[in-house]
Each structure stands twice: as C-alpha cells, then as structure tokens.
UniProtKB/Swiss-Prot annotation:
<dbReference type="InterPro" id="IPR007083">
    <property type="entry name" value="RNA_pol_Rpb1_4"/>
</dbReference>
<keyword id="KW-0479">Metal-binding</keyword>
<keyword id="KW-0934">Plastid</keyword>
<dbReference type="GO" id="GO:0005739">
    <property type="term" value="C:mitochondrion"/>
</dbReference>
<dbReference type="InterPro" id="IPR012756">
    <property type="entry name" value="DNA-dir_RpoC2_beta_pp"/>
</dbReference>
<comment type="function">
    <text>DNA-dependent RNA polymerase catalyzes the transcription of DNA into RNA using the four ribonucleoside triphosphates as substrates.</text>
</comment>
<dbReference type="GO" id="GO:0003677">
    <property type="term" value="F:DNA binding"/>
</dbReference>
<comment type="similarity">
    <text>Belongs to the RNA polymerase beta' chain family. RpoC2 subfamily.</text>
</comment>
<dbReference type="InterPro" id="IPR038120">
    <property type="entry name" value="Rpb1_funnel_sf"/>
</dbReference>
<comment type="subunit">
    <text>In plastids the minimal PEP RNA polymerase catalytic core is composed of four subunits: alpha, beta, beta', and beta''. When a (nuclear-encoded) sigma factor is associated with the core the holoenzyme is formed, which can initiate transcription.</text>
</comment>
<dbReference type="InterPro" id="IPR042102">
    <property type="entry name" value="RNA_pol_Rpb1_3_sf"/>
</dbReference>
<keyword id="KW-0808">Transferase</keyword>
<dbReference type="GO" id="GO:0000428">
    <property type="term" value="C:DNA-directed RNA polymerase complex"/>
</dbReference>
<dbReference type="Pfam" id="PF04998">
    <property type="entry name" value="RNA_pol_Rpb1_5"/>
</dbReference>
<dbReference type="Pfam" id="PF04983">
    <property type="entry name" value="RNA_pol_Rpb1_3"/>
</dbReference>
<keyword id="KW-0862">Zinc</keyword>
<feature type="binding site">
    <location>
        <position position="285"/>
    </location>
    <ligand>
        <name>Zn(2+)</name>
    </ligand>
</feature>
C-alpha cells in the first residue's frame, strides 16, 4: 500500500466509505473487494469480544421536557388570544401552533443529544443512534423525546402533536394518531413499486437506441464550468475537456483538449486557481441518436473511457429508475412522523442593544405566522452592544433573506431570538381556506389608517352578534323596540289578498309550504248571444268555434276537471277571427308600409327615428336645400323592381342621424293599406319533356301546365330549370298585348277608367310590366288588389257581469301581418295575408294565476264563464327563504264566499325562543332582513372597566377575551356591550386597484418598440406567424417572408397579452362636451365623429375596444379623457393558430391576495363564508412527493403554476425583465430563472427563450442617428440555444428531487435521457420543403434540409422547438417497431403503414423483436462494418456505369 497516510483516529461510516473508494481508484475492484472482506472479519472479531446491551433504563427522558411543554402550551394560548383580538388570522394561528410544536420537539431532541454527550457518552442508545448502521436520530427522538407532530392520511400536519414518547407510553388518542403514518408507509410500499417500475420502462424505451458509436463527434459546443457556481467534484470526475487549460500566470499548458478529468487534475486546477474550463457532455454531442466516447467520458463502473458499442441509453434508464424502487421504502421506517427542518435561528447571547450597519437594507414583511418582521434585502451585519461595559461588542453577520424580529436600537434580553434564515427548499402547498362566521351577526368594518398607495390593504372586520331573521316579500314588522318577545310569536307577517270575489278552496294542504295553494272561483260572468261549438277537423290546432254576436272566431279549448266546462288554453291570442276578407286565391307579393310593423319591432334599428317622422318647416330651411334634395333623390332610386316605392330603412344610419338628430320631430300619419300582386307558383321536380307549355307563353285560366296541374289564373309563364329538371313554374296573372314601344310604360301604374294606346281600357288598378323576348315585345298588365286594414281598437264591453259591474279583462283586437313586405310568397294555394286576433289581459293580476273555463247555456243563449284565481304560496317566498322556518295561518274557511281584496291569511316567520330586545335594525334592500340584538348578545361592564369608552366605540379586553365588542348604551355607570369578534384579513385587494378600466391596450406600429420609464420592454416576436402573400413571378428568386402586423399589447386585470393586430376597421370617438347651462347637469353626447374604412372580409370576428394607454396616471390626467372606440376585426380563417392573443406575463406575476366577501353593515347567518385566506402548508418531504415529481418533470407536464408565497409580498417575476444588478451584487441577465424551478412550466419557458432569441435588436450609431436592426439568431441557433436552457432546467430540477431524498445519480445518465426529450421541432411554415405545417421533425434533420434548400435559393422552412415528455418521445421514436412495442400498438402501426415508413433497425429493441443480433457490445463490430461494405459496393457499381458510358 503505497502513499497511504496512516490514520490514527476513530473510523466511522464516512471514513469507511472513503477508505474503500480510495482503494478502488488506486488499485482495482479485486483489491478493493478483498479489503472489504478483511474489514468485515475484523468487525465480527471485535463484535464477539465485547457485547452491547440495552435495557429500558437506558432510555432516559431529559428533565427539561415538562418545562418545554409548558412553554409551548403557553405560546399557543397566547396565539389563540391574539387571534381572538383580531391581530392575526385563523390561518396564521394554525401556522403558529405548528411552528411552536416543531420548535419544541426540535429543541427537545437537541437536549437529548447534548445530555447523552455530556453525561452518558457510552449509553447504548446513543451509540446505536450515531453508529450510522441502522437507527437514526429521529427514532431516538421518538423513544426519549416526544413523538411530535403527525401527518394525517393526505400528508398534511395535524395541529395536535403527540407529546408522549415511547418510554412514557402513548395514550389511546396518541396511538390512533400514530396509526395514520404507519398505515401510509405500508400502503405506499405496496403501491409505489409499480410506479417506479413503469418509470424505468419508459426511460429505457426512450433511450434504448443510444449506443456509443464514434470516438469523437468534433463538437464545438461545451459547458463552461465556473468556480463560482458550486459544482460537485463527483459530477466532474470522468468528464473530458473540450479546450486546453493554461496556467493563468505562467501561461503554460496544464491540460490538453480531450483530457479526462481526474481527482488529481481537479486538485491541480484548484492549486493554480483556474476558475474556468470547458467540458463536454452528452448534451453537447453532435451525433444523431447516439453519443461519442469523448462526450460521454468515463464508464463509471471501471473509471476508464467508455467502450465503443456500449449501450449507454439503457444504462442511463436503469440508473435513474432503480433508485425509484428504493425511494418507495423511505416512509416505512420513520412511521409517518412529520419531520420539518427546524429553522436556523440567531439567538442573542447577552442582554444588550441592537444596532444595524448602514449598508443593511430591509423591507417590512408579514410572515405566515402573522408577525411583522424585517427582511434583509442584502447581506450585512448587525452589532449587539452588551449592558455591561466590560463585555466586548458582538458582531453578527447576516445573509440575504434573513428575517429579523428586532428593530434597530432595540433592547434585547439574553437568549431571545434575533432573527432566522428563510429556508427556500421546504416543500409547501398553497391553499385557500374559507373563513366562516362563528356566530350570526352584523358586519362592521372600522376604517384602518393605511397608506393609500399600496396595492393591497389590510382589512379588519368585526362580527357583532345578534339574530338575523329573513322576511318573505311584502311583509311588515310586528313589534317595537324594548319589547319582550315570547316563544313562537312572529316577527314578520305577509298578507295574502285575493283580487276577485268567489268561493275559497285550499289545495295540497298536507304537503309542504311551497306546494300549497288557495283557489277562489267565481261563476258570475257570461257572454250574451254566444255559444261554443266543436270543429271535427281542427284548423291550425284550433279545435272550437266561438259564435259571438254572429261573428265567428276560432278558439283553442281543452277539457277541464268538471264535466260541462271547457278550459281556455291561451289568452294571447284568445281567439282568432274566422273570415275570408283577406284570403287570396294564389301566392304573390304583398306590399305595405313597413313602419306599421315597426311600432312593434323598433328595437331592430340603431336609432329608432325613421323616415316616418317629417321635419318641420322652419327646421327644413336650416338644412341646406341641396342636401335634403339629394337625400330624397336617393330615396327615389330605391324603387322596387315592380315599380313600388316602400319606405324601408334604406338610409344608412350616418345620413339619417346627420339630418334628424338636430331637429324637433313630428309624427306623420301612416296609412294601413296593403297592395297585393298575385303570382301563382308551383314547385316541381320533374322532367322537361312532360311540360305542356313553354317559357313566356300566355295561358288562359284552368289550363293544364303539366299533367294533373291546372292553372288558377291567366297570365304569362316563367319556367326555371336546373340540369334539365324543372324546378319552378310561376304564372304572373294579367293580360298580354303584343307590339312595340312599350319601354316608356314599364313600371307604370294605371287606375280604373284610364285608357292606354287609345284602345286598352283599364278596369282595375294595374301595373304595367314590359317583357322583352327574343321573338317579340310583350306588355303584361297585372291587376293588383288593395286591401284596407282596420285600425286596432279596444273592445270595451265584451264580457258582462250579471250585476253589470265593471269587466275584469281588457280585450284588444290585434292585427298581425303574416308575411314581410316585398316578400314573394311562392305557392298556388289560398293564403291569409293578415290574422285578426282577440287578446285577453286580466286586469291587475298575475296573468298565470287566472284560469277561465267556458260552458254553454242554451236556455239563456249565453256562454257562462268560470274564473278561478290561484294564490300560490311560493310566489310570496323569495328563493333564498325556501328552507327557512316560515309558517302560515289561514283566516278563511273552505267554501266560504269572500269579497275581493279580503285578507285570506298570513305568512309569518316565527321566533324559536323568547327574547328581550335591546335594539333592532331592519334592512329593506333586495333581501328584507331584521337584526335583533337581545340580552343574550350583550354583556354589561362597569364604566371604569370599559376604559371610559362611549357609545359606538369598540372595546377589546386583554384579560377576558370574551368581553370584546361594541358599546351600545352608555348610562353613566354601566356600558352595555354588544359581543363581537374581530377577524383580520391581511393583503386584501384594495378597492382602488380594481379600476373600472377593464381592458387597456396600446397599439404599436411596425417598427417602433415601446419603452416606458419602467424597465419593461414589450417587444415580442412570434415565430408561428404564417406568411399570407406568396404571389411571386416565375423568374423572381423567391425568399420566404413573413407578414408583418402592428403589435397590440392588451392589459386586462393586471395581466399583459400581446397580439399581432389584424385589420383595423373603424375608429369611433365619442367626445363628451360639457354643457355650459346650469340647469342641465347632464353630459349630452353631441356629435358622433365616425370615420369609416370599409374592408369587406367575410370571415371576421368583430370586436369593439375602448382605447387607453397601458399605464394610466391618475394625477397627471389633465387632458380631457376621450373615449376612443376602435372597432377591430380579427380574421377567423387562416390565422386561428398564429394570430391570437398571447399571454406575455405568465401567472407568476400574479399576487396572491386574500378576499373579503362581505360589505359593511351586512347581516350574516352563522356559518357563512366571510372571506378567503391563502396559506401555505408544509407537507412531509417523503417519497410521495419524490416519484410523482420526477415523473412530472420527465413527462414535461403542463401544470398550472401553483404559486409559492415568496418571502416578499409581491411575487418576484421569475424572468427578470432587463439585466439588473441585484443589491447583493448577484448579476442576473434576461432569461435567467430564479430558484423556483419546480414551479416553472417548461413549455412556457421554452416559448419565452425562443422569442427572446428571435428578437430584433437595434444597433445605433450616434453620429448620423443610423439605426440598424438585426435578429439575434437564426431559426436553428435559436432552437438550439433554447433547448440547452430547457435541458439544464430539467436536469437541475430532477437532480434536486433526488438529492432531497439523499440519492446521488451521475448527471450524465440524466443528460442522455433529456437529450432524447429535446430533439424535435414543429414546422410552422413549410417554405419550399416537402414537409407539412405542424409536422414534427428532428432539429438536425430540418437544419440539413434547409441548408440544401437555401443553396438552391428556395425558401426554407420555419419551425419552433418542441419539448416532448418521455412517453411522447418514445412514441415518436424513428423506429416504428420500437414505438409499437411500447404503447398504442395499432395506432403506431397503422400510421407507419400509411406513411410507408422504413425501419432501419438501428436500436436494440427493434433487433430483438425481429430476432437479429443487437448492435451493441459484441454485436457492435458487425453492425458498424455492414455500413462500410455498403459504401464499397456502391462505388463499384458507379464505376461500372461509367465504363459503359465510355
């Protein structure tokens, strides 16, 4: 054994490890194993010579335990009191309890250890605990300290600890609580092994084809190892240097490139103080689907360079998966004890005064235990000046992020806590906890003095106790203040009142309150001279005829529950007039003044002034005449093709308002005439050959057009056909004259008595139509009918009473047009143009509650009516009162006759026990409530005790917490205090921050970047944009270019989004001008300035935005604020992928705020939610968090970020916006992520980096103000660099999980796997390549394709990097046999078959499945040779071809 220094010390577990490692690296594995054997025999030899015994007496419980428990209990009581006083929230109290217990249990453990160390170093328990063999400290702590806090089944902490230990014995509750953890350990072991096995399978599947195939890939990229970054020497040994290392002083060569790093070499670097060197890694290797020897480095099992043909992928998969199976066993041993690292505390050694150094910067912060502390923003120091002058001044160094519980110049006692470090690596879970009210009561929010400029405010609200009673609708109160109220007396009453007289009847009496109803029936009404008759065949589902004063109406009736009565179904329309006055023979076109309808549908116009209003004469002169005449001319042009002009809303709205908005308007009389042009239409579907007439023929009445179809009118036929099939035949009724010179008669109207061409007499109003055929000119004279439509009027006396009292229904005649004006009704049957209905409207009653039954009475020739009114109780009970204790009492008997407007009964809300009222308040908002403060809710206090407070002030009693509340009455000696309890909500959203500006945005032209004085540059380059225009001439060299859009940044609810802006449509601006008149304070909108830029695009998504700057300054706004509206249209069609709204700020920037859900003065019931609090829970750091976390990282899950409460109030933005120098001089550049890597969504980070690398940077040259903009990197470079960043992120995240579990895995294994996850890109624009958009290809592949394409001056493809999880990556394996044998077999195989893919059998799995020798290890030689043979044979073939040519 050469150069081994003899160690004459105690050798424990750690030294043993070092000894064996030394012998392994110095000699070899044989020697090391022999040494291990020898050590084993040595150990056994001495173990048999001296024994160790353990008895129950060795378990000594430290004497200080009781003191500590008492102190902890006292702290907890204190916390409860503070909480009741409203200084801390419920959640903070919980946190405080847990902290108190974990500190107590930790310090108890330290006591145990120090006790053993000083008094009993050979105690067998102590020896076992520190031997490093099996037992550990946490078990000793359970034996002789206290078991401490336990975790419940979901991994959260229970707030009651187990105070006993195993030496003292557990109580029954303790025992039950212990059961949770133990069970969890067993279950985990059973279930989690499967998980870890599956993880291994996926890892091996993704990396199975990675084999060492080359000696050197000649890469130029590498990792820079920096001495400032705390690197692990373990991870560096066995790597290979990329660049040579020189001595910084003498500039001599220390290590050449491609040297393997050994421990000696690293030590040499340390001596020479070489801080930076470059190493290779599997991530930097250039080979495709394999790795070269140099990049991989040592094979760790024999400390030599890895062999060619070694299957490193499978090694990597196994090395990562195997610890998973071990990790599952972790919880089993400790039995589910909750272990949280105790915080490192700074404890004052002496009494003295604290002073901070000048450079120490602090901010005020509220911790999750509700303490206000100072947090150091940079590292610095503080000094403690002791009381005694003889003692020395003590200086304490502070790190960054230390919490200080003291302020500067504060006096502090010995062993008080000065500060503590914030630990960052705890595993926590942020939750929201609803805070419920303990008692019913009234909410009172006192105003706190706060600084107004904070985004969040602290809220304090009191709940002052009392009883809340809800009232039914329309109720009245039933008592006065100072009353005593007996049990079961009522507070509210609602009267139930009927509308009509009649007989009463109560239905559903024994069911619950909501279903009960009271019915009042009256049979005294009738219709004279009328009867009802059943129609055998219902016409349009109307099944009865109502004969009334010799008029017939159609009516719908159904059978009612009694024999002779029929029940009406509808009241609107009640009956439809049955006459043929408006019935036409055939179809046609009808015209009427559309404004008649518009009385009813006026909401369909933008401003409901239409041309139905005339302008008064004097206003007419104001408008320039020509303007008005133009406008009338425009109207004249809008003449229907049949020669009628009808007032439609022809005018577009701008012209209208320009004329009409400025004038007083007069109503113009509208005539209800209707013009009818008949045109008979047959819809057919038949062959051309059956037709018996031709297009343009004139036929007589009753003429057969096609077999079995006979015309009803005479006229000209028009036939429309499609594909030799006749679709439609129309007959325009009228008389036809042959001749010439008919043009001037076209579209003219003639009236009876006029004569055309001296020989044609007109007998009825007609329209002339000129028909020009190839053969001849024809003049068609079409007669039209004019119908006059009666005005609607109210029928007064339709229903009469026996006593002739006033009727109970309002009856209206309603006329409805069944067709639109100008609409062609294509039919040959009879149609009704209008329908005349009678509508009934019951006076002063809810419509649905009245039911009408009819019955014929032939003796008296009248129709009897029976009117029933239903009073449903549920109409009087609002929805929120459905399940409260409402009662009701009836004052009427069944079948009693009552007059109208009688009180039938009451709905009441009862009181459960008798009270003496001190005070009451009632509210009449949307919910009616009464709040009673009775003696039970009050306490009386002597005035001296109440610190001389007067009425309406709040009292907090420090000693007796129950005596807290608001003073109601002060009578000089005693105070009556209404009990109350404060609740505290820190960091609530202040109302100011919810500005009403919902969506703000800023538009940016194409080339300007926007800069505010804040350090945010919003410059966002989106790579997924597709190019729009590709019309290029045949001889032009074509290059890919992208469409540029102006950018738009949108801010909504404090989040920023960016969107490449599509087409602008309109820019409205509504300018408010304030009137100078005093009497009208209203702002009138005076004018609309509307600029129109019409773009006719079909597929658009219109959007109206209110313009504003992104950041408004309330103080500086002196300019009048214009409400600019911008109408945007988003193109729907080609852009749904790329043009949209992208979020710029992720949710990391969101602050967590607590919410309060109630307003001042509200009454709430017991158990209602007052607000929500956010809080962090620590969860036990065992395997349950380990394996799933690793799986989540390797599967690259897109999880929503769950925010951790960082120490400061505002979340640190995880991507620091510009390069900024931190006050503790840590230099951070854009895009460096801060430690929170477990909360980062890797996909988003990928996007952010990629966009960053694609930014156009501007380079300025100052003399001529010459600016040049240049993109940072090209597409390949950007993707490559982005991938590198993400690879490191995932690597560090996975390693941190394994390290937290105490498992060490060599980085290179993880690197192999991660390399496989980050090779693919997604094509966004294909250019001239044969690829498709959204296709997934390898990065090196697309680079190769683009190289060739650019060499030919064609357009390259554009792409974005894609991160695949291990399952996805395994399915995207280039070999379809490997992918199909992994998962989703049929899908993978069908896809491969359709694409016609070829499997080159490169990996191990494919070859095993086919049955070949695997291409690694011994099979590697034959595998690499087969490629060489191929190449040789190819060249031979080429030679032969050349020979033939010669």
């Amino acid at each position: 054994m050469k150069d081994y220094i003899y160690q004459n010390t105690l050798i424990n577990k750690k030294q043993l490890k070092e000894l064996l490692a030394w012998s392994f690296s110095k000699y070899d594995s044989m020697q090391a194993s022999l040494l291990a054997d020898e050590l084993k025999y040595l150990g056994f030899k001495y173990a048999t010579q001296a024994g160790i015994s353990i008895s129950i007496e060795d378990l000594k419980v430290p004497a200080t335990k009781n003191e500590m428990l008492e102190k902890a209990n006292k702290d907890i009581l204190n916390a409860e009191k503070i909480c009741l006083k409203g200084k801390i929230t419920d959640v903070e109290r919980f946190q405080k309890i847990i902290d108190t217990w974990s500190i107590a249990s930790e310090s108890l453990k330290d006591n145990v250890v120090s006790y053993f160390k000083t008094y009993d170093p050979l105690n067998s328990v102590y020896i076992m605990a520190f031997s490093g063999a099996r037992g550990n400290l946490s078990q000793v702590r359970q034996l002789v300290g206290m078991r401490g806090l336990m975790a419940d089944p979901s991994g959260e902490i229970m707030r009651v600890p187990i105070k006993k230990n195993f030496r003292e014995g557990l109580t029954i509750t303790d025992y039950l609580m212990s059961g949770y953890g133990a069970r969890k350990g067993i279950v985990d072991t059973a279930l989690k092994t499967a998980n870890s096995g599956y993880l291994t399978r996926r890892l091996i599947d993704i990396a199975q084809d990675i084999v060492i195939r080359e000696k050197d890939c000649l890469t130029s990229s590498s990792f820079l190892i920096d001495s400032q970054t705390k690197f692990d020497t373990e991870q560096l040994i066995g790597r290979v240097l990329l660049k040579s290392v020189y001595d910084s002083k003498t500039e001599k060569l220390i290590a050449k490139a491609n040297t393997q790093l050994t421990l000696d070499l690293l030590n040499l670097f340390n001596q020479k103080q070489i801080s930076k060197f470059y190493i290779r890694s599997p991530l930097t290797c250039n080979l495709y689907h394999s790795i070269c020897q140099m990049c991989y480095g040592w094979d760790l099992s024999n400390q030599n360079l890895v062999d060619l043909g070694e299957a490193v992928g499978i090694l990597a998969g196994q090395s990562i998966g195997e610890p998973g199976t071990q990790l599952t066993m972790r919880t089993f041993h400790t039995g589910g004890i909750f272990t949280s690292e105790a915080r490192q505390q700074i404890i004052s050694p002496k009494n003295g005064i604290i002073k901070f150094s000048k450079i120490l910067k602090t901010i005020i912060l509220r911790t999750n235990r509700g303490e206000d502390v100072l947090l150091t923003k940079n590292s610095g120091s503080l000094i403690l000046i002791p009381e005694k002058h003889t003692d020395e001044i003590i200086q304490i160094e502070l790190l960054r992020n230390t919490m200080l519980f003291v302020k500067s110049n504060q006096y502090i006692k010995q062993s008080a806590i000065i500060g503590e470090l914030i630990s960052t690596d705890k595993q926590t879970l942020t939750e929201r906890k609803p805070i419920l009210s303990d008692t019913a009561g009234e909410i009172f929010i006192p105003r706190l003095k706060t600084r107004m400029n904070l985004i969040t405010q602290n809220r304090l609200l009191w709940i002052l106790s009392g009883q809340v009673y809800q009232a039914p609708s329309n109720s009245f109160l039933n008592f006065y203040t100072d009353h005593k109220i007996n049990k079961n007396s009522y507070i509210f009453r609602t009267k139930l009142i009927n509308q009509y007289s009649g007989y009463t009847k109560v239905l559903n009496q024994n069911k619950n309150l909501l279903e009960q109803k009271i019915q009042i029936t009256n049979e005294t009404y009738f219709l004279e001279n009328s009867y009802v008759q059943k129609i055998l065949k219902p016409i349009t589902n109307k099944n009865y005829l109502l004969n009334f004063n010799n008029l017939t109406y159609l009516i719908t009736l159904k059978d009612s529950n009694s024999k002779n009565w029929k029940r009406c179904k509808k009241y609107k329309p009640f009956a439809t007039s049955f006459n043929n006055n408006f019935k036409t023979l055939t179809g046609g076109i009808m015209y009427y003044d559309q404004r008649i309808k518009q009385k009813f549908d006026s909401f369909n116009t933008l401003i409901s002034y239409n041309i139905a209003y005339e302008i008064s004469k004097e206003d007419y002169d104001k408008v320039s005449k020509d303007h008005y005449e133009n406008y009338l001319k425009k109207l004249e042009n809008k003449i229907d093709k049949n020669g009628f002009i009808f007032y439609q809303n022809f005018l577009n709205y701008q012209e209208m308002e320009s004329i009409f908005l400025k004038f007083k308007l007069k109503k113009k009389i509208v005539h209800n005439s209707l013009i009818w042009l008949s045109e008979e239409t047959y819809k057919l579907n038949c062959d051309k050959n059956i037709l018996l007439v031709e297009n343009g023929n004139f036929i007589a009445k009753n003429f057969e057009i096609i077999p079995n179809i006979i015309s009803k009118t005479a006229g000209i036929i028009t036939v429309s056909q499609k594909n030799n099939m006749i679709e439609e035949i129309a007959i325009k009724a009228g008389f036809v004259y042959q001749g010439k010179q008919f043009e001037q008669l076209d579209k003219k109207v003639y009236y009876p008595g006029e004569i055309i061409f001296d020989n044609i007499k007109i007998t009825q109003p007609s329209l002339c139509e000129h028909i020009n055929n190839k053969s001849n000119n024809q003049l068609l004279i079409r007669p039209f009918a004019i119908y006059e439509i009666p005005k609607e009027k109210t029928v007064k006396s339709l229903f009469s009473d026996k006593n002739n009292s006033k009727s109970i229904f309002t009856i209206t005649n309603k006329i409805t047009y069944l067709y639109k004006t100008n609409q062609k009704i294509k039919t040959s049957n009879h149609i009704n143009l209008i329908s005349q209905n009678i509508n009934l409207k019951a006076k002063n009653s809810v419509q649905n509650n009245t039911i009408i039954d009819l019955s014929n009475s032939f003796k008296t020739k009248r129709l009897n009516l029976r009117i029933s009114e239903n009073l449903l109780l549920k109409h009087y009970i609002p929805a929120h009162l459905k399940y409260t204790n409402l009662q009701y009492c009836l004052l009427v008997e069944p079948t009693q006759f009552i007059d109208s407007y009688t009180t039938l009964g009451y709905l009441e809300s009862l009181i459960t026990n008798s009270l003496e009222i001190v005070k009451f308040k009632s509210k009449r908002a949307n919910k009616k409530q009464v709040f009673l403060i009775s003696n039970k809710d009050c306490i009386t206090v002597r005035k001296e005790q109440g610190k001389n407070k007067t009425a309406n002030e709040l009292i907090i009693d420090n000693i007796n917490v129950n005596q807290t509340g608001k003073v109601l009455i002060d009578n000089g000696q005693f105070l009556t205090v209404q009990k109350g309890r404060p609740y505290f909500f820190p960091n609530c959203k202040s109302d100011d921050s919810k500005e009403k500006l919902d969506l703000q945005y800023k538009l940016i032209g194409l080339n300007n970047t926007i800069s505010n004085n804040t350090n945010t540059f919003l410059n966002y380059y989106d790579v997924t944009k597709r190019s729009l225009v590709e019309r290029l001439g045949p001889n032009k060299k074509s290059y890919g270019f992208k469409v540029k859009f102006s950018k738009m940044f949108i801010k909504k609810n404090g989040k920023f989004y960016s969107s490449p802006i599509p087409l602008f449509l309109n820019n409205f601006s509504i300018i408010k001008e304030e009137q100078k008149r005093l009497n009208e304070g209203k702002n009138e909108i005076n004018n609309f300035i509307i600029k129109n830029t019409q773009l006719k695009i079909k597929q658009c998504l219109p959007l109206l935005l209110k313009s504003s700057e992104l950041v408004t300054n309330k103080i500086k706004r002196k300019t009048p604020f214009n409400n600019n509206l911008t109408g945007l249209k988003f193109l729907k069609y080609p852009f749904n992928k790329s043009i949209g709204i992208h979020s710029l700020t992720e949710d990391y920037f969101e602050q967590e705020v607590n919410n309060v859900y109630c307003k001042n003065g509200e009454f709430i019931e017991k158990g209602e939610v007052i607000g929500l609090l956010n809080f962090e829970k620590e969860i036990t750091g065992d395997i349950v968090q380990g394996l799933p976390r690793i799986e989540e990282l390797l599967e690259a899950r897109k999880k929503k970020p769950t925010n951790k409460h960082l120490a400061t109030n505002q979340k640190k933005s995880l991507l620091i916006q510009k390069t900024s120098i931190d006050s503790s001089f840590e230099f951070q550049k854009l895009g460096t992520t801060i430690k929170e890597n477990d909360k980062i969504n890797p996909h988003n980070l990928l996007k952010i980096y990629f966009n960053y690398y694609g930014i156009k940077k501007q380079f300025f040259s100052n003399k001529e103000m010459f600016a040049l903009s240049y993109r940072l990197t090209d597409n390949y470079e950007a993707s490559y660099r982005t991938f590198k960043k993400i690879q490191l992120l995932i690597l560090n995240a996975v390693q941190s999980v394994y390290e937290s579990q105490g498992v060490s895995i060599a980085n290179k294994h993880l690197e192999v796997i991660i390399k496989q996850m980050t090779t693919k890109v997604l094509i966004t624009h294909e250019g001239h390549t044969p690829l498709l958009p959204r296709e997934v290809v390898d990065l090196y592949h697309i680079q190769y394709i683009n190289k060739i394409i650019e060499a030919h001056n064609k357009r390259p493809a554009y792409y974005v990097p894609l991160l695949l999880g291990i399952t996805k990556a395994a399915l995207n394996n280039p070999s379809f046999i490997s992918a199909a044998s992994f998962q989703e077999t049929t899908r993978v195989l069908t896809k491969a078959a359709i694409e016609g893919r070829v499997d080159w059998l490169r990996g191990l799995k494919e070859n095993i499945i086919i049955g070949h020798l695997i291409p690694s290890g011994t099979g590697y030689q034959s595998y690499s040779n087969c490629f060489n043979q191929l190449a040789q044979s190819k060249t031979k073939i080429n030679l032969e071809k050349i020979k033939i040519k010669i």
